[in-house]
Amino acid sequence: MKERVRIGVIGAGAIAQLAHLPVLSKMRGAELAAICDNDRPKARALADRFGIRDTFTDIEDLLELDDLDAVVVATPNHLHEPHVLSALAAKVNVLCERPLALNARGVERILAAAQRASKMVLIANNHRFRTDVQGLDRFVRGGELGKITGIRAGDYRLQRTTEGWRLRRAEAGGGAFLDLGVPLLDLALWLTDFADPIRVSAHMERGKGAGAVEQGMLVQITFANGLVFACDVANDYVGQEERWWFEVIATRGSARMAPLRVVKELNGRATDVSPSGAAGRESAFIQSYRAELAHFVAVVREESPYEPPADQVRLLKIVEAVYKSAEEDKEIRL
């Protein structure tokens, strides 16, 4: 087993600067080997800041590095699939920011390429690694809340992006729902062992101009087991404070984040059984990335089991149905 996993970071945008680079630069068992971005001065400045020796503007040059074990793909959404495929062709393990591809067929191509290369590809679903989510997961999987009948979730933010790839549907793949809603949908599916959806209804607030991404989306998904998932997201919300919520309703209790609050029926009464403990100083965002990246390093070092992200095929098929429903203004049956 190698003492340290040598990792290259592809893409030097906000998520790399806020999460991947600062976390990996201090992580035991990991070494930042190189950074690649088409903005060479930015890449060089970040390399100097985080003690990275090599910088590149071409992914193929980075992939030729000796003893490169893995890469983090943090490029614009439409580049995820080609960049992941290039890394796998070079026999390098991959952690890719979400979405893994712009559609389900793209994920299937990536899974097939990973199998051919005998390499691992993981998706950066950092929300699954949040401390409060892990606590909720223990209540759900332990059966303490009973059968889940509904999940209500939402994310309201004010993001005044005026230019760039995130505003163009062809490059971003979507707007408010893809960016804010899909992590909530993935979390709902993950907590319910990817229940089978049977119908989708969605309504969106369209962006301005042809080919623009949506500013908001209201989604309802009904599953074969009776579960209903409702999601409301907006990236143009003007209010006193931004809001993020995730609520589970079950036959013997309920739970809500954030912070995590859990109520169970005990002796015929609703009783607060929320886990206690001091809140950490670290934000949920950084804590989740630290846990996710530690897991990635452990998987590459073969200290933790590898699970191919086949569930992302099912996720993106639902996402495709959501957008179809919103575009055609009708319910879609699956």
Predicted regions and their residues:
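Active-site loop of classical SDR/Rossmann-like NAD(P)-dependent oxidoreductases
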Residues: 15, 280-294
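Hydrophobic residues in well-ordered beta-strands that form the structural core
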Residues: 16, 56, 73, 96, ...
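Predominantly a Rossmann-like dinucleotide-binding segment in NAD(P)-dependent oxidoreductases
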Residues: 120, 127-210, 329
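Beta-loop-alpha module in the N-terminal Rossmann-like domain of NAD(P)-dependent dehydrogenases
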Residues: 39, 50-113
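C-terminal helix-rich "cap/oligomerization" subdomain common to oxidoreductases
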Residues: 1-4, 70-72, 224, 295-334
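Contiguous beta-strand/loop segments that form the cofactor/metal-binding neighborhood of enzyme cores
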Residues: 1, 186-261, 288-305
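N-terminal Rossmann-like dinucleotide-binding module
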Residues: 1-50
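Short active-site oxyanion
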Residues: 30-34, 69-71, 174-175
